[in-house]
A protein has these predicted regions:
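Conserved Radical SAM active-site core
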Residues: 32-69, 76-184, 188-196, 205-213
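Auxiliary Fe-S-binding modules of radical SAM enzymes
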Residues: 1-45, 51, 235-280
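Short hydrophobic alpha-helical runs that function as membrane-insertion/retention elements
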Residues: 157, 223, 255-257
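Conserved strand-turn element in the central/C-terminal portion of the radical SAM core barrel
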Residues: 190-192, 199-201, 214-236, 259-262
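Active-site glycine- and acidic-residue-rich loops that bind
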Residues: 163-166, 230-241
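Non-catalytic positions within long, well-ordered alpha-helices that form the structural scaffold/packing
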Residues: 150, 216, 245-248
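A structural motif
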Residues: 153-154, 220, 251-252
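Short catalytic/ligand-binding loop motif for oxyanion handling, primarily in non-cytosolic enzymes
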Residues: 87, 132-133, 233, 263-265
Length: 280
């Protein structure tokens, strides 16, 4: 098994200068298996798991859950990269390879949902980093999270690039019987070279679209978010047409599709010069 060769380290061992301040009490796991070599996971016990989104934001939701910080999907344009600097890590390589795992997320959520002050409001997931990144295959936090939401009949939505969502089909179906469940898969383009250049850790776009169709085949409402559309890279008529055709090929198996635009961030802007060389 690919997870059998992990190494368990104490954050108190080794060079303390390399351990972020927040991780002094974390369990640190590293891997020497293909696909995970160079990755570091910081297992922490979070104090809370449901975050409030300020009303001043233009988001359509007010509550979110993010069981991970950092993301192996390594999308170069990701707006959440800057949040890694708050943990004394960088927004580039560290964001892709040093992931914080909130191992007590399901337990915290159950407590929140049972608290007298909770009004059963909609909770959005996948809004910051992908909750179905590869680490989820090991930690399985989403199964506990979905089960908690199901048991409380609390409405929720998930946005992901991860085909691993199909693993939780059984729980999603059970949740959909008692509450509103909204699912979206992100796939803005189908160009293979572009995908490998700017979304190197994600499943292929075609696989994501197929995962969306499979969810619909099983009675769950799932749409494709054609986003983010990356300026100068995936916004040409040819690129957009190819993506629409791929989605349309699934026919009635896709409930809906809507576009979204990537907005420039400091890391996004700096990386664009590299993309020009990669894709030339």
């Amino acid at each position: 098994m690919r997870w059998d060769n992990l190494r368990l380290d104490s954050a108190d061992d080794g060079d303390q200068g390399q351990v972020p301040m927040f991780a002094r009490d974390a369990v640190v796991r590293t891997f020497d298996t293909p696909g995970f070599r160079g990755m570091t996971f910081y297992e922490v016990h979070a104090k809370s798991i449901v975050s409030h989104v300020p009303e001043s934001s233009r988001m359509s939701f007010r509550w979110t859950i993010n069981p991970y910080r950092g993301c192996q999907h390594s999308c170069v344009y990701c707006f959440a990269r800057q949040s890694h600097t708050y943990l004394d890590m960088d927004a580039g390589r560290d964001f892709d390879s040093r992931v914080v795992v909130k191992v007590n997320a399901p337990e915290l959520l159950r407590k929140k949902l049972a608290s007298p002050g909770w009004a059963g409001e909609h909770i959005a997931m996948g809004t910051n980093v992908d909750c179905y990144q590869r680490a989820e295959g090991r930690y399985q936090l989403m199964r506990g999270i979905i089960a908690a939401l199901r048991d409380a009949a609390n409405p929720f939505s998930i946005l992901t690039k991860g085909t691993l969502i199909l693993r939780d089909l059984d729980l999603l179906l059970e949740a959909a019987e008692v509450t509103d469940v909204g699912l979206n898969v992100s796939a803005a383009f189908v160009d293979t070279s572009l995908w490998r250049a700017i979304e190197p850790g994600t499943p292929a776009p075609e696989r994501r679209i197929e995962a969306c169709a499979t969810l619909n085949d099983n009675g769950l409402r799932c749409g494709v978010l054609m986003g983010p559309v990356v300026p100068y890279l995936s916004d040409s008529p040819a690129q957009l047409d190819a993506a629409v055709r791929q989605i349309a090929a699934a026919g009635e198996r896709i409930e809906r599709a809507c576009p979204g635009l990537a907005r420039p961030t400091p890391y996004f802007s700096a990386s664009s010069r590299t993309w020009a060389v990669i894709l030339a």
